[in-house]
Amino acid sequence: DSLALAAIAAHFARRGDVRVGAIIVDHGLQEDSAAVAAQTAQTLTDLGLHPVITEKVQVPVGNMGPEMAARTARYTAFTKAVEATGARAVLLGHTLDDQAETVLLGLSRGSGTRSLAGMPPVRVEGGVTYLRPFLGLRRTDMLDICDAENLTPWIDPTNTDETLMRARIRHSVLPYLEEHLGGDVARSLARTASVAGPDAEYLD
């Protein structure tokens, strides 16, 4: 998803509409993570993004669990990169499918209205503006973009590790719901998020 986002952003950067760089966050959770980060940095440089920053982070799990610990470390790296470059916003490659998973995760934790709202397309956190331009697109659309640009995305092994809640929702729960309820459950969940978003924002 992030590689497809980089390709689209690079397209607009080449037109001179915006200046776009990239940050690669190496969580160090796989043995070859440094090599993957280096290869990704080269790919993004070849696309014309500048600067391309690689940030190695520590992921201390503690009491928050591996997924939340990785997210916390990642967003800390984003903040550091914004401060170093003066970037006006951070683009994130979350898709409609990610949104559906986030809604289900929130519901499973009893997060109330905020869980139904999922991820907002625009959010300011820690003084940094985050934009999610692909919340209306499917994960398959991201793969199509990569194919069209002759890019080979790296598939994070944790995305298929069903000991992690999000991967379990992606590969087991959502397919089960769609099989037994019928219809496009992921799209329905994402639509619910878009409707509930303004309410959650108001309540906040």
Task: Describe the function of each predicted region.
Residues 1-175:
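Core alpha/beta nucleotide-donor-binding catalytic domains of modification enzymes
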Residues 164-204:
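ATP/NTP-dependent adenylation/nucleotidyl-transfer catalytic domains that generate, transfer
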